[in-house]
Amino acid sequence: MHLNSFCLKKVLWVGLSLLVGGISINTHAVTLNFSASLVQGTCSLSLDKSVLSLGDVQQANLRSETLLNLQPVTLTVDNCNGAASASLQPVVIALGPGKSQNGKWLFRSSDSDVGGAGVMLVQSASQPSYASTEVKSGDYFPLAAVGQTPVNKQLQFFAGVSCGGVTDCATVKPGQLTANVNFIFAYR
């Protein structure tokens, strides 16, 4: 009897396999696509004012190697997140149109109609003078060491009107002076 039950089980399994194998089932396939972006860490940048008015400057007061109507502006770097690359340094880069006059970079937009003058920007916690090192387009300000994520930080700047040296100051004409500087978070 034991042999018969073994044979009966085998026959049932073979029959069931043939039955299931012989049935045609319509199948439908769907595809699941994946995507992801790998990004470096970043920070939020904000200025304490969006427009920095340098007021009216008397043409007669705009002399060689002077910096007039200085005004402070603060750049805040915060909400930093994500991991920094082990070989790169987080920085803020200053970019803007202008030109070098008497060895000093003066920011100035192409729509300015004033002659010979521009805006000198200095990164300093205290009021600078014309002799201070100015910010040039492309200068960068480190926020942390290489491979480190920055912590909240404030960078103090001062901006003032200048005409550079004797030659450029001789070409000063009255008009509207506009300048812009973009501060960009980057890894270097």
Annotate the PLM regions.
Residues W13-G22:
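Bacterial N-terminal signal peptides
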